[in-house]
């Protein structure tokens, strides 16, 4: 089957379309139209702060690892103590909580002759020190504590504080234990804010105390060192991923190199230089060996404080900047120079850092020592401190204080792995520079690899570590694999993405904030224009640019310096573009007088300035005038300097910009091209064409084809942000974009802007291609769009455009409970306890013990009973003893002597039909994640939940009773993001009716949470809050955004004719599954 694929990538969505085509490429049938909505990897409990699941789970994982390793370390210490014949007694078993401090002071002060007493007290002291052992430089080995340094600054500060607080002199040789015992124990606060030990002590301070104790207790040197080893034992997770490093495809026995390594940084510069070409008289030539080495040396050794510029590279080569091309070509590693030449990023990052000791060390270190430092700073490499250069790195780290170490953690070096090993990179770099060849030729000469060969790319769905990107990769991978399995390989895959589609949500919000600030600034300028210039109506964007340019230029013509105003000025492109269109960037547009604009015409300013006789026109004078320009309102001075510098570069350019072609609409985003290369390699054997374009292309295509005015969404025709189906529609439109069409769309967009700036008649609509081939391709494309619009109209009308999300069925989904730890309520066991009190029991065992008491009544609970006696987990509890109850009615968990609320940490909800009444009733059991932990290796949706679980205790009473009597039938389960098809005719609230009156009947709803034991939270599946307009009815915001529709479970399932829809990757309804995947079911 022949079909085209379109993929539209957004921040929280991926539009996917598969369209069957005939032999002529005309669309004949839609195979799959899916708007896949995802969470961009955000933690559901941290959406406001845009913290990802990856970040949250990383914190939780590191915390668990910290506790796990501490527990293991203390267990090893206990075993060591037992091997010495000393007893291990829990510190809590001593009646005096300050006893360990007194023992430590005693051991350091005098010899204890009784061997048994000495052994017990040594055990107490070592176990106490090991639990509060201070900080050590993570790069210093434990053996460095055998001969500890003198007192740390923190130790000295604590000594002075104790001297002041106690009023007693503190000997210079006092240990930590001895200093503490000088305080009034029990009256002064020891730890925490305001405590005498609030300063962070070093492990060397505690090692000195152990050294003094061992000396006083006559412990030999060998045993002393063993004690130091076991008390201060530490593990580092650094390098734990080194075993998973990929191999070099050219030398499979070697690991792929770090991108922060010197070998890769030099290779990257050499490879990108190899892509450069010089344009001479319409021909292109490669750089000579001498030219390549000149440029390479300049970029590698560029002063860190100086920014790299292509203009400087052109000057080194003795050419005009416009003659230098090939600056945006991508290498095998997905590296692209783009706006600036490549530099040694590792060197610049370190030297530009504000970590003075590191900068000084780096400048004097050898290449091998710098290499060892990069490995040490990388979490992915194992430290090599045994080599001579590694030892120097360790020595450097050992001399740093903890403040500098904190700064080191914030140092950002280039991340990721190169495609090749360091040896391969060095050899390829040497070959490219010595022979003056490009990467492909160097690879052929060095390894005998054909130029057409490319390094193997990861599979489409392989994670990259960015949660938002990983969501996109997984979605695209699953959909393409299913499509290929169903219909074969596609003929074309066209990918389009918005700027925020391949960045984190946090970064997307930052960019959105910048856009809002610019919009507010522009709105203020628009108002200023209307007031000062008496402009009628809202000024255009072109008017705003002209107004800003005139103000910025001190009301002077940028070319000759003569006075201009907003009304008599004209906008001109400093450097015109070859062919149709212009470069419509701010740095290439200036306000000029009519005389200069007419005289210059379609010529670069630098060329025209040499030949014109107009007074004041020269490159030198134009550059001088920019020095006096006024900074734009709201623009930072540093940004304005960069802007004027870019304008100066344009003034000096003597060649035209390159003609617009299909590449003008291609994406330059690294991750977009990474996705393209993965998809291309996946379909390499099928000859599938794969392209990736910038997000603006779809909007241009919709407008140019007229398809926007033909498709009706919920809120009318045209672009819709309210209707989530537009993502799939955009994907369908992009699927039929060819290189010729993309090029024509780019030119039309460019002409539109140019003509607006020049105040010319809008003739851009008439442009359909630069030559006969382009115009023919345009006509065919318009025909395809006509047929496609008919297909899409039918699909929208018949509700065949799918909006779906992945549902999370695994056990872990966000935090298991809230962070705040509260105090348990304590009541006497003999007290009267209501049923609600008993349901607040702090453990399942306590709940069971109370409900199994002879006097328990399911309605009244337990009466007061001074003789009551129960057993909880083998422990006898008597009437006078306290029992712990949760002080809140919400689901909670006992934790660290207190409790934490479980919040909305539900894994799923089970729907039951209760048959004990006159007519069937429906109820819901919300299942907490914690109640499923014992069953993680079983079917989580069918395991039996006992009455004592928090899930059962939080359920409606009618459901608990029905389950107890066997009158509840388990129908099926729901999870967040499940799709429900609902007939709202009998159950719609006034708010839902108001929304349906404005937008039409809403059949498809999304489960957005389990609001209460008896209510769901639903939102319209196909609608997004982003599209809610200010003039919309208030009910629209309440139903789509907050709080959503909160229908009672019984009413919804009794009168809503509900179907729970489950779909496969292509959006098709799944009615059965041999793989035990979730299937569609109907509530009846």
UniProtKB/Swiss-Prot annotation:
Residues 504-665 form the HNH Cas9-type domain. The keyword NADP does not apply. The active site is at residues 8, 573. Endonuclease activity on target dsDNA requires Mg(2+). The simplicity of the Cas9-gRNAs RNA-directed DNA endonuclease activity may be used to target and modify a DNA sequence of interest; this enzyme has been tested in human cells but is not highly efficient. It comes from the Bacteria. Its cofactor is Mg(2+). Mn(2+) 1 binds at residues 8, 496, 500. Mn(2+) 2 binds at residues 8, 500, 727. Its EC number is 3.1.-.-. One of its GO terms (biological process) is defense response to virus. GO terms for molecular function: DNA binding; endonuclease activity; RNA binding; zinc ion binding. Keywords: Antiviral defense, DNA-binding, Endonuclease, Hydrolase, Magnesium, Manganese, Metal-binding, Nuclease, RNA-binding. Pfam families: Cas9_a, Cas9_b_hairpin, Cas9_C, Cas9_Topo, HNH, RuvC_III. Has 2 endonuclease domains. The discontinuous RuvC-like domain cleaves the target DNA noncomplementary to crRNA while the HNH nuclease domain cleaves the target DNA complementary to crRNA. CRISPR (clustered regularly interspaced short palindromic repeat) is an adaptive immune system that provides protection against mobile genetic elements (viruses, transposable elements and conjugative plasmids). CRISPR clusters contain spacers, sequences complementary to antecedent mobile elements, and target invading nucleic acids. CRISPR clusters are transcribed and processed into CRISPR RNA (crRNA). In type II CRISPR systems correct processing of pre-crRNA requires a trans-encoded small RNA (tracrRNA), endogenous ribonuclease 3 (rnc) and this protein. Belongs to the CRISPR-associated protein Cas9 family. Subtype II-C subfamily. Monomer. Binds crRNA and tracrRNA. This is CRISPR-associated endonuclease Cas9. It comes from Corynebacterium diphtheriae (strain ATCC 700971 / NCTC 13129 / Biotype gravis).
